[in-house]
């Protein structure tokens, strides 16, 4: 085909103005026309020139408009990234000009839902042709060739597509369909990507919450009896006065533990207490609490009475009622959780002269409470600990005691220190969180380290997070090797 053929005075209404790059600077409109006319009649070629030079010199690129859309697309398919012109090092770059994006296919393509499965492409074209020229119509079909009851059609202009939506959306119910016809703009690639990422994020958050909650229920087995009894007495009948015994240990934070509780949250915490109590083989701590107004008497009874929790793991099935607890307790304020942290400090000072076994038991008990709080209230617990830990832990490389330092591999590329900190803080107090960055590319190496202040938290994190899936990969979480080893992991 050449430029001497008969053709209209103007290009077709759906023609495309194309940008062409990687053109020899020595080429004029004549050489370019000879190249492109083999694909169709050329309406116009405009070589971009540097006007600051005299005479103006080609910039090595141009705009070209064919008389037909078909010719432009054929030229693009044959030349773009395919043909290298004389004297050039890279192949031709050919794509619609920026001005053509206003008429992109995605802006003119419609999705048609609730289509009768008896309809074919011609039926759809006939139904919508009243609104303008249709470039393409396609019925979605399954592997068996049967219609899926939906279709795509592409008009030559966006205004035609808009008229079709206005006139046809839910205007009729087709044969064999339970709802009126659906006519809307088809999802763009960007829309599809956003939906996919949103769904993936929701799934990951659900998995993370589930892992935090059920992976740490074993921590309830280490709760000292007085904590379970205190929780049960506190929440039953909305009686909050029993928390007054915590004031000497937690100060104003003990009040904060109750200020955010409503009736529904109290009821669910009572469910927790009842379920946890079912896992115990002794009621002595509960009676000790009921007859005592001093926290020291509770601690004394804890230290002198044996706590037989060895068989409690067999009763963990009774904790199934906790599944809805995380959502129901969403109204707890950050001060409530801060009270738990303050409680730990108060207990430590109150027991400075206590026996080693008593202090160890209470340390385990607090660890269980801390992990349960993270499981039941992941979002708020994270907020509280971010304010307490985030300033010092994120980005630092301090090490915790032996057995409390973790190596994490297969992290998402976009994860930073704060993301790593937030993911692992539900399992205990974090000393440091560090994602390693490639100094050359300034990109994450997809691994990092977490250090807790105790080995119990590290083991809880391994149990819940090792193998946890994020995107297409699963986290690898393991103890960091000793300094004496040749490799840190």
Swiss-Prot record:
It is found in: Nucleus; Cytoplasm. InterPro entries: CELF1/2_RRM1, CELF1/2_RRM2, CELF1/2_RRM3, Hud_Sxl_RNA, Nucleotide-bd_a/b_plait_sf, RBD_domain_sf, RRM_dom. One of its GO terms (cellular component) is nucleus. One of its GO terms (molecular function) is mRNA 3'-UTR binding. The keyword Repeat applies. Belongs to the CELF/BRUNOL family. This is CUGBP Elav-like family member 1-B. It comes from Xenopus laevis (African clawed frog). The lineage of its organism: Eukaryota, Metazoa, Chordata, Craniata, Vertebrata. The gene is cugbp1-b.
